[in-house]
Amino acid sequence: ISACLVGSEMCIRDRILASVVMLVTGYMGEAGLGNATVWGTVSALAYFYIVYEVWMGDVKKLATNAGSAVASANKALGWFILVGWAIYPLGYLIGTAEGQWYAGFANIGLDMDIVYNIGDAVNKIGFGLVIYALSRKAA
């Protein structure tokens, strides 16, 4: 996957592609379109690629070069992706556990939809508040 720099702007094609791979393969596993462990692994690899890019890859380098405000925003983004998005694999494990090596996740007493709703609330509301706070700080 290429670094994709164009002038002073970063081409986000690779990150969008990784996001699509993460979502589509996760859906395929949840929908029972093949082995859930295989689809979950492919989805997880795309997730870890995005985490890597934000914390150590081209996204981090560009943010650092853009100044402290952008680097600070990138760090907040990194934490949301690392911690906030980690809620979704838990829902995936709960929803696809039957007959898999991780079948114990089906018995932890949580409903997959509730886990996803909590993840959505944490990520959407929390991320919006962080972006708002960073914009106020920059103004």
Please describe what each predicted stretch is.
Residues 1-7, 11-12:
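Single conserved hydrophobic/aromatic residue that forms the stacking wall/gate
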Residues 20-30, 89:
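Hydrophobic alpha-helical transmembrane segments and adjacent interfacial helices
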Residues 27-38, 48:
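Membrane-interface helix caps and helix-loop-helix hairpins in membrane proteins
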Residues 25, 46-68, 91-95:
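Alpha-helical transmembrane segments in multipass membrane proteins, preferentially the mid-helix core
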Residues 13-22, 43-46:
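Mid-membrane cores of alpha-helical transmembrane segments in multi-pass membrane proteins
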Residues 53-56, 76-139:
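C-terminal transmembrane-bundle signature of multipass membrane proteins
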Residues 39-47, 116-120:
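Alpha-helical transmembrane segments of polytopic membrane proteins
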Residues 32-37, 55-67, 131-135:
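A cytosolic-side transmembrane-helix exit/cap motif
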